[in-house]
UniProtKB/Swiss-Prot annotation:
Transmembrane segments: none annotated. The keyword Glycoprotein does not apply. The active site is at C334, H421. Catalyzes amidations at positions B, D, E, and G on adenosylcobyrinic A,C-diamide. NH(2) groups are provided by glutamine, and one molecule of ATP is hydrogenolyzed for each amidation. The keyword Protein biosynthesis does not apply. Pfam families: CbiA, GATase_3. Pathway: Cofactor biosynthesis; adenosylcobalamin biosynthesis. Belongs to the CobB/CobQ family. CobQ subfamily. This is Cobyric acid synthase. GO terms for molecular function: ABC-type vitamin B12 transporter activity; catalytic activity.
C-alpha cells in the first residue's frame, strides 16, 4: 500500500510535527495525502463531522495534520483514541464514537477489536488517497508491547509500510537511540526501516555530518535530513508532555494563568490567547502561580471530580475565590466550568467512583454526568458577536435563575463558564472577551491565519532540510531490498 510510517526513538521525538510537515510537503506536490494514527493516547481531541452530520472525535494532532494535508478530517484518520481518566484506566473512542473503558489489566483482551478496527481504517484511507502518512506512538522498540502492537511495526507489517525513525537530538544520545531502536527489532521489522530524520538540531551542521555518515555506515540506512530547532514551530499538541514549554513568547502587560490540572484536556483552548501581544500566558499548579494573574482559566479535564478534589487539596480553590473577590475575571471551560458550579453529580460512575461533589459555588449551575457523550459543533452568539466551538462532554448542565447564558454555559459578573472548546480561536469572540474582561482593544490577530503560517513554515523547513523527493518515492515504492540486519534483534 502507498504510505509511510513515521516512528520515533521516544515519545515527543517529533513524530506529530514531522507527519504534519510531510503532509504539507506532499500536498504541495499535488499528492492526495492523508494522515493516520492507529491509536492515540491523549486528552486533547477535536470534533469533526461524521456520517450524516453527526459529530465524531479524533486526536487534535490528526486534525491539524489533516489541515496540513488539505484533507477533510475524519474518524478513519485516528480510529482508536484513548483518553486517560486515571493512571490505570482509559476511555476508548472507536472510529470517533464512545466505545467504553479499558483498564491496563485487561488491555490485551480488548486489543484485538481495536487492532482490527485500526487496520480497516488504514486500508480504507489507502484506497481513497495517493499516500497515507502514518504516525507511530512512543517507540517501535518497546519489546514488551510488540506482540500486541498495531500502531508501530505491527501496522507497518500489516500494510508493508516503509518506516523512518525520527530522533530528538536536543535531548542528547540520538545516535545510540537510532542504532538501539533498530537493533531491538526483529529481522522482519528491520527490513521495513528505511532510515532516519534528525530533529531539533541547533548549531553547525558540518559538525554533525561525520556522525550522520557513520550512522549510515553502521546501519546501512539513509539519513533523510536534519530538521533545525525552531522556536515558533509549535502546533496543536496531542499530550501534556510539552506543557512546560507552552508559554507565550510575549511579555505582555496582562498575565493569564491557566490551572494545570492533573487530567487536563484540550489545553489548546488557550493557544489563541498565547498569540495576543498584550498577554503573557503561563500554566500554574499552586496558589502562588495564580496570585498576580489578571485572568485565570480553569481548563477542561477528563476527571472533573477528581481534579476538583486535587484543586482543593492544593489550596487553589481559595486562590480562585480571592481572585473573584478582587473583581478579576475567571473563565472555566467544560470540566473547569463544571467545577465553578454548585454541585457535580456522577450517579453512574462515568468519570470515577465519587457519585457527587460540591462545586465552588461561583456559578448558579448544576452538572449531572450521563452515559452518552455529547459531540457537537455549536454556533451562536456570545458577547454580541458570532461564536463557534466544539463540545466533548458527558455533563448535562442545569442553570439556575442567577445564571446568565454564555456559550452553552453561564456567566455571573466576571465569572464565565462555557461548554464550548475552541471558542477563543474565533477572532471576534476572543476580541470581545478580552475587551469585556481586561479592557483590551483588538490586536487584529487571526488565529486561523497564524496556524496556517506555522503549517507553511513547517512545510518550508521540511522542503529545505529533508530529501522530500526520496521520501515520496519511498512512500510510493517501498524500501530497498536486502537492508542489513543489525544484531541482536528482538529478544
Amino acid at each position: 500500500m502507498p504510505g509511510l510510517l513515521v516512528a520515533g526513538t521516544t515519545s515527543d521525538a517529533g513524530k506529530s510535527t514531522l507527519t504534519a510537515g510531510l503532509c504539507r510537503a506532499f500536498a504541495r506536490r499535488g499528492v492526495r495525502v492523508a494522515p493516520f494514527k492507529a491509536q492515540n493516547m491523549s486528552n486533547n481531541s477535536m470534533v469533526c463531522q461524521g456520517p450524516g452530520g453527526a459529530g465524531v472525535e479524533i486526536g487534535r494532532a490528526q486534525w491539524v495534520q489533516a489541515l496540513a494535508a488539505n484533507a477533510t478530517p475524519e474518524a478513519a484518520m485516528n480510529p482508536v483514541l484513548l483518553k486517560p481518566g486515571s493512571d490505570h484506566r482509559s476511555h476508548v473512542v472507536l472510529m470517533g464514537r464512545s466505545w467504553g473503558e479499558l483498564a491496563s489489566s485487561n488491555w490485551f483482551e480488548g486489543r484485538q477489536v481495536l487492532a482490527e478496527t485500526a487496520h480497516r481504517a488504514f486500508d480504507d484511507l489507502a484506497a481513497r488517497y495517493d499516500v497515507v502518512v502514518a504516525e507511530g506512538a512512543g517507540s517501535p522498540a518497546e519489546i514488551n508491547l510488540r506482540a500486541g502492537d498495531y500502531v508501530n511495526m505491527g501496522l507497518a507489517c500489516h500494510a508493508e509500510l516503509p518506516t523512518i525513525v525520527v530522533g530528538d537530538i536536543d535531548r542528547g544520545g540520538v545516535f545510540a537511540a537510532f542504532f538501539g531502536t533498530i537493533a531491538l527489532l526483529s529481522a522482519e521489522d528491520q527490513a521495513l526501516v528505511a532510515g532516519f530524520v534528525v530533529n531539533k538540531f541547533r548549531g553547525d551542521l558540518d559538525l554533525l555530518a561525520p556522525g550522520l555518515r557513520d550512522l549510515e555506515g553502521v546501519t546501512g540506512r539513509q539519513v533523510f535530513g536534519t530538521l533545525p530547532w525552531h522556536a515558533d514551530l509549535w502546533l496543536d499538541s496531542e499530550d501534556a508532555l510539552d506543557l512546560t514549554g507552552r508559554r507565550a513568547a510575549s511579555t505582555g502587560a496582562h498575565r493569564v494563568a491557566v490551572v494545570r490540572l492533573p487530567r487536563i484536556s484540550n489545553f489548546t483552548d488557550v493557544d489563541a490567547l498565547g498569540l495576543e501581544p498584550d498577554l503573557d500566558v503561563v500554566f500554574a499548579s499552586d496558589p502562588r502561580g495564580l496570585g498576580d494573574a489578571d485572568l485565570i482559566v480553569v481548563p477542561g479535564t477528563r476527571a472533573t471530580i477528581a481534579d476538583l478534589a486535587w484543586l482543593r487539596a492544593r489550596g487553589l480553590d481559595r486562590a480562585l475565590m480571592a481572585h473573584v473577590a478582587a473583581g478579576k475575571p475567571l473563565l472555566g471551560i467544560c470540566g473547569g466550568f463544571q467545577m465553578l458550579g454548585r454541585v457535580i453529580r456522577d450517579p453512574d460512575g462515568v468519570e470515577g467512583p465519587v457519585a457527587e461533589a460540591d462545586g465552588l459555588g461561583l456559578l448558579d449551575v448544576e452538572t449531572t454526568f450521563g452515559a452518552e457523550k455529547v459531540l457537537r459543533l455549536p454556533r451562536g452568539q456570545g458577547l454580541g458577536v458570532t461564536a463557534s466551538g466544539y463540545e466533548i462532554h458527558h455533563g448535562r448542565i442545569t442553570a439556575g435563575d442567577a445564571a446568565q447564558q454564555f456559550l452553552g454555559g453561564a456567566r455571573d459578573g466576571q465569572v464565565f463558564g462555557t461548554m464550548w472548546h475552541g471558542s477563543l480561536e474565533g477572532d471576534a469572540l476572543r476580541e470581545a472577551f478580552l475587551r469585556e474582561t481586561l479592557g483590551l482593544t483588538g490586536s487584529g490577530t487571526s488565529f486561523s491565519a497564524a496556524r496556517e503560517r506555522r503549517l507553511d513554515l513547517l512545510g518550508d523547513l521540511v522542503e529545505r532540510h529533508l530529501d522530500v523527493d526520496a521520501l515520496l518515492a519511498l512512500a510510493r515504492h517501498g524500501c530497498a531490498p536486502a537492508l542489513p540486519f543489525l544484531p541482536p534483534g528482538a529478544p
